[in-house]
Amino acid sequence: PEFLEDPSVLTKEKLKSELVANNVTLPAGEQRKDVYVELYLQSLTALKR
């Protein structure tokens, strides 16, 4: 899969599905989009480097 340098262009739902698809545990409850963007950067964009 292709990991974005700037995941904030994705919708919140898309961010969540990408995280789940890569076995990243989502925080409980509904979070603000930037929480998922941060998770994406830490978990997925970091893997690419």
From Swiss-Prot:
InterPro entries: LEM-like_dom, LEM/LEM-like_dom_sf, LEM_domain. GO terms for molecular function: DNA binding; hormone activity. It comes from Bos taurus (Bovine). Belongs to the thymopoietin family. The lineage of its organism: Eukaryota, Metazoa, Chordata, Craniata, Vertebrata. Residues 4-47 form the LEM-like domain. The keyword Magnesium does not apply. Residues 32-36 are annotated as: Biological activity. This is Thymopoietin-2.
